[in-house]
Curated annotation (Swiss-Prot):
Record-given protein name: Large ribosomal subunit protein uL29
UniProt cross-references to NCBIfam families, sorted A to Z: L29
UniProt cross-references to InterPro entries, sorted A to Z: Ribosomal_uL29 (IPR001854), Ribosomal_uL29_sf (IPR036049)
Family classification: Belongs to the universal ribosomal protein uL29 family.
Gene Ontology terms for molecular function: structural constituent of ribosome
Amino acid sequence: MDVKELRNQSVSALNEMLIKLLKEHFEFRMQHKSSQLDNFSKLGKTKKSIAQIKTIIRQKQA
């Protein structure tokens, strides 16, 4: 999702997305450790999305 679209979301919606992404990131890490993950860029992309959402949540709370 684009950053502009994320900024238009409510904090509760962002928190739901954050939880979903954290679960996905955990699954990708486990797949990576067990050598089942084919596309390693998924790890970086989810990590970046998590950071973007956390930043937007903090900006909205300030």
